[in-house]
Amino acid sequence: MRIAAFNVENMFQRTKVFNQSDAQLAKRISLAAGELNLLFEKPRYSPADVRRMRTLLAQLGLDRAAQNRYALFRDIRGRLFRRTDAGLEFVATGRADWIGWVELRAEPVNAVAIQNTARVIRDASPDVIAVVEVENRHTLRQFSDRVLTQVGGSPYGHVMVIEGNDERGIDVGLMTRDDYPLRLMWSHVHEKTAAGSPLFSRDAPEYEVRTPEGRRIWVIPCHFKSKFGGDDAASRAKRAAQAARVAEIYRRLRDEGNEAVAVLGDLNDTPGSEPLRALLQDTDLQDISVHPLYDRAGLPGIGTFGRGADRDKIDYILLSPALFSGVRAAGVIPRGAWPGEGPKPRWEAYPEVKRLEHAASDHFLLWADIP
């Protein structure tokens, strides 16, 4: 059985600001939109809240119009403010007075990039694959049935995505072959932190997969809190809480007698990081990238995005001892990622990856052959 994990960075629609080259602009817009939506949820808006909303709306250019190139202000019922010649006049006193939000606009992913995503999955040919940053189940189904087959791949019989708490459409999904049915699913999307906010922005569901021989393998796809907005204390604490909870889920599965468990996906931190300690150091899960049979595919380290150096390791396939001990082969596929410009590319990419926008993803696919 071959298992894989791949952060595809969306199939058909990608947040528009993330498709341009200015990382600082993307960071500012993403953070401003996120902070605004949190402020909107307050039951009462203080004068300080209103001042901050005014500043953030101006940063997004939404003080002058309801939409622009990168952001959109949706006013569904009631009204947050009026636009006047003198500026914004706030009329809502709290969340109960209106319904609305700010969302980041999306645009179609480059058609060549979509096909390169399919080529990566075709070449890996996993029986079970965790797909990170996918829009929804329908999108993943269409990708499997339409795009994967266009490049000579085989469609997947079972496709599942559980919608998470992140409004950007970057959820985690699972695809399995016809003879690897999904028997049970357990979502953790409603779990809260001590402060009452969602613990998982993207769900960390449990799937029971049955093999053709009738064995049970539990698969937990993950996408932890990103460092994109800055690796601050709040970001680290969120990843630590997510890692600790997934470690609890893993221990429960093992205590229930399940020896075959895989935790996989984009954990958004490095192997020695403190936020991932509960999962990587405090359980008996083992990282496939340290297995002696792991094939780096010519990369300088075990990294899974960027340049492929050790410091670029943020994607994982973590296996329980029973699975890790039986690994027959494992590796990484960087061929769909942009190898850089110049006469000496960082790795051998597909001939179709001629420009940055042709890249399947910034991430590489991980795979392992397990018993």
Model-predicted segments: where are they?
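N-terminal, active-site-proximal structural segment of metallo-dependent hydrolase catalytic domains
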Residues: 1-150, 160-165
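Second-shell loop/turn segments in exported
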Residues: 102-108, 125-131, 161, 194, ...
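Loop/turn elements at helix/coil->beta-strand transitions in domains of secreted/extracellular proteins
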Residues: 1-2, 124-128, 154-157, 214-217, ...
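Structured beta-strand-rich core segments of catalytic domains in phosphoester-bond hydrolases
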Residues: 65-66, 72, 76, 109, ...
